[in-house]
Amino acid sequence: MKVLICRDVSSLKLESGNNGKFDLALKDTKNKVDSSIDSLVNSAIGDIRENGYAIVEGAISSTMASDIKRALAPWLQGKQMGRNDFEGFRTERVYALLDKVPQVASLVEHDVILRIVDAFLPLNYLLSSALAINIYPDETPQRFHMDDGDGAMNVRRPHPPIGMSAIWALDDFTSENGATEIVPGSHKWDHERQPDERESITVTMPLGAVLVFGGNVFHRGGANRTGIPRLAITPQYGPPYMRQLENMTLAVPPTVAAQYSERVQALLGYSVDSPGFRGHVNGRHPRLLVDPHYKGRKYRKDLPSS
């Protein structure tokens, strides 16, 4: 089976003029870029609906990937290996990344990825988890699973994705170093069907690419048969009515969240859901915890893109 690659986003980037504003002469070019990105987003959405996943290459530059990797280095010391076979005894996981590595925010709120997620999740969805996964040499494959809980929520398959996941490659993903394996089309299977290894594909992709898929798709971390670790960042997004995997407003307290954009703050949970005022703090909007001057009520759809 062929891996689906929507497009290399890096070719769609434009350098801005002074003060971040595009020169008038670039307006037509910018319109073409916007149109190309719209096309890419629509293509990715179509691939996810049909096959369960999509890959966007060049979503971040190699320089940005290196910067994030460098900022992560103090937390990647081989001291937080998995506690069981599923987590991986040779896999290092670092949680609460937005409390530790601010650069990760650029992945969490990446506009192209959020536009894809927007098509599948309800308004005001939340960041459920954001972690680094570093697969060390001699790690064995995970069991196949779905991020929607693999039956834990008593929802029979097939069903629409309850959550959406992104896996950002901070190293090249190869067939030998623990690249994610995914089962195309498994989001359409009936409840009893389980994956066979022969039905999966290995998602090989270059540094800077991102795999986006529904929580209703079978996948797993692969075996690392090389001599070096393979690093990825994995943000997961979920509906506003469901408890987050990580308790984000404790993991990223107001004093830390204050440095981020309104968009990231809303994803963390410093936001309310409609209808009503679900998520309030003592009857007040939680954004007041990070911005005492906050005046109005905004939903994430009203916030500017990053």
Give the ranges of each region predicted by the language model:
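Non-heme Fe(II)-dependent double-stranded beta-helix
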Residues: K2-N51, V56-V155
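Short hydrophobic-aromatic micro-motifs
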Residues: I55-V56, W168, L211-F213
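Aromatic-acidic/polar surface patches that form glycan- and anion
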Residues: S61, S106, H159, V203-T204, ...
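A short, structural micro-pattern
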Residues: L126, P160-I162, G227-P229
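A structural signal for short, well-ordered beta-strand segments
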Residues: S129-A132, A166-W168, I233-Y237
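Catalytic core of non-heme Fe(II) oxygenases with the double-stranded beta-helix
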Residues: E139-T204, M242-V252
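Conserved double-stranded beta-helix
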Residues: W189-V212, G222-S306
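Short, charged beta-turn/beta-strand-edge "cap" motif at the junction between a beta-strand
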Residues: V217-H219
